[in-house]
C-alpha cells in the first residue's frame, strides 16, 4: 500500500497544484456534461430506446476474484430492511467535501439519499470519488461530511461501501477536467454512515426510501415522477457559506436511453427547480413512491425546459453491480456492512488509487 500511496501522492500533488491561485468554490467537474449529439442516434438493437455511447473498455474482475470480498458479501447477520420514509426530502443527504493545500481550497457538493435503514447512502461515483482522495490525504487535508436537514448541516461521516471499478478505470484520465464529459454509465456508489459528528450514537434506523430495480417499460414516457436533491445554484452564486436547501419537484419522463443493453439505462426528466449543479445523486421516484432512478447529469434544456435532468435507472445499477461483484444491489444492502466496507477499503482502494495514478500518465 505504501508503494501505491507514493505513486498516488505524486499524482495528487500535480492534481492539486495545477491551479494558479487560491480558489474556493464548487467544482464544476463534479457535474458531467453530455455531449450534444449523443441523443440523436437510435439504437440498432432496440428501436424503442435512444442510444447513448458506451465508453467502457473492460470490466475489472478484482471483486469477483477476491475471496475476502466474496466472503464478506455473504457473511454476517441480516440487517434492517424495507423503507422507513416516504417523503424524499426526509431521505436526502448533502455530501460536502473540501480539499485544502497551501495553494488552494477546493470545495465540492453533491446529493445522496438513504437507500437502506442501516445507513447506506446511494450517490454518484463522481461525488463519492472524493472519498478516495480523502482516504489518501497526502499533499493536503481532505474532509467530507454527510449533511442533512433544511438547511443542510453536518451530521455524519461515511466510508465507501462500493464504487464501480469500471467507472473509475474509465474516468481516471478525466477526473481533474474542469468540465468532464459523461453519460452517467455506472456513475453510482454506495456509502455507509460510520459515526455522528456531534459524538452522539448513530440512529437506530435511517430514513430510507422504497426502491425498485425492475426494468422500465417504454410506456414510462410522459409518466409523472418526483425528483429531489440539493441544487447548489445559490451556493455557486453567493459562495460556499450559503445555506443549501433541499428541493423536490413534480416532473415527468421525456425519453428513455440505452447503452446498448436493450434495456432502459437512463431516462430524461423535464425541467424543474431541482435541475441545477449539486442535484446529482438525488432520487427520482415513480407514482408508487419507489425510487426508480438517480440523477446523474444535466439534460437538454432546449428540449425539456430549464432545469432538465437525466437519471440512471436502478435496473442499470442492479445489472452492473451484479456483473462486477457477483451480487445484486439488494444483496449489497444485507449482511455485515461494516465488515464489507473494511474489506472494500483493504481490497479495492489501493487498486482504485493505482488506476487513478496511471490514468494521469
Task: Give the ranges of each region predicted by the language model.
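N-terminal targeting leaders that route proteins to membranes or the secretory/organellar pathways
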Residues: 1-84
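A conserved glycine-rich beta-strand in the N-terminal activation segment of trypsin-fold
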Residues: 77-81, 96-118, 124, 281
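Extracytoplasmic
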Residues: 87-92, 107-110, 116-118, 122, ...
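Active-site region of chymotrypsin-like
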Residues: 88-105, 194-210, 236-331
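Catalytic-histidine neighborhood of serine endopeptidases
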Residues: 109, 116-183
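Active-site substrate-binding loop(s) of clan PA
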Residues: 131-132, 170-182, 193-243
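C-terminal cap/linker of serine protease catalytic domains
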Residues: 143-148, 152-169, 199-206, 231-233, ...
Amino acid at each position: 500500500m505504501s508503494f501505491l500511496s507514493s505513486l498516488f501522492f505524486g499524482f495528487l500533488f500535480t492534481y492539486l497544484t495545477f491551479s494558479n491561485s487560491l480558489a474556493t468554490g464548487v467544482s464544476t467537474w463534479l457535474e458531467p456534461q453530455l455531449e450534444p449529439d449523443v441523443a440523436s442516434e437510435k439504437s440498432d438493437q432496440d428501436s424503442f430506446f435512444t442510444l447513448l455511447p458506451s465508453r467502457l473498455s473492460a470490466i475489472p474482475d478484482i471483486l469477483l476474484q477476491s475471496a475476502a470480498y466474496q466472503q464478506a458479501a455473504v457473511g454476517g447477520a441480516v440487517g434492517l430492511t424495507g423503507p422507513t420514509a416516504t417523503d424524499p426530502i426526509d431521505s436526502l443527504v448533502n455530501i460536502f467535501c473540501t480539499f485544502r493545500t497551501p495553494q488552494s481550497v477546493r470545495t465540492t457538493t453533491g446529493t445522496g439519499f438513504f437507500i437502506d435503514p442501516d445507513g447506506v447512502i446511494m450517490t454518484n461515483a463522481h461525488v463519492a470519488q472524493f472519498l478516495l482522495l480523502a482516504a489518501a490525504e497526502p499533499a493536503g487535508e481532505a474532509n467530507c461530511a454527510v449533511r442533512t436537514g433544511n438547511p443542510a448541516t453536518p451530521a455524519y461521516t461515511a466510508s465507501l461501501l462500493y464504487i464501480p471499478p469500471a467507472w473509475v478505470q474509465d474516468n481516471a484520465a478525466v477526473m481533474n477536467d474542469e468540465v468532464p464529459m459523461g453519460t452517467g454509465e455506472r456513475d453510482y456508489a454506495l456509502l455507509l454512515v460510520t459515526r455522528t459528528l456531534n459524538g452522539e450514537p448513530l440512529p437506530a434506523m435511517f430514513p430510507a426510501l422504497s426502491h425498485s430495480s425492475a426494468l422500465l417499460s417504454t410506456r414510462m414516457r410522459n409518466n409523472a415522477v418526483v425528483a429531489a436533491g440539493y441544487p447548489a445554484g445559490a451556493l455557486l452564486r453567493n459562495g460556499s457559506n450559503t445555506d443549501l436547501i433541499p428541493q423536490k419537484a413534480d416532473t415527468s419522463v421525456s425519453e428513455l436511453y440505452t447503452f446498448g443493453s436493450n434495456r432502459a439505462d437512463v431516462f430524461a426528466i423535464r425541467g424543474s427547480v431541482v435541475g441545477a449543479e449539486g442535484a446529482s445523486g438525488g432520487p427520482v421516484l415513480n407514482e408508487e413512491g419507489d425510487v426508480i432512478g438517480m440523477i446523474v447529469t444535466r439534460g437538454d434544456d432546449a428540449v425539456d425546459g430549464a432545469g432538465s435532468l437525466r437519471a440512471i435507472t436502478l435496473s442499470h445499477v442492479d445489472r452492473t453491480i451484479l456483473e462486477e461483484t457477483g451480487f445484486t444491489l439488494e444483496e449489497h444492502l444485507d449482511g455485515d456492512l461494516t465488515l464489507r466496507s473494511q474489506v472494500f477499503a483493504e481490497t479495492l482502494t489501493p487498486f482504485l488509487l493505482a488506476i487513478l495514478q496511471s490514468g494521469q500518465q
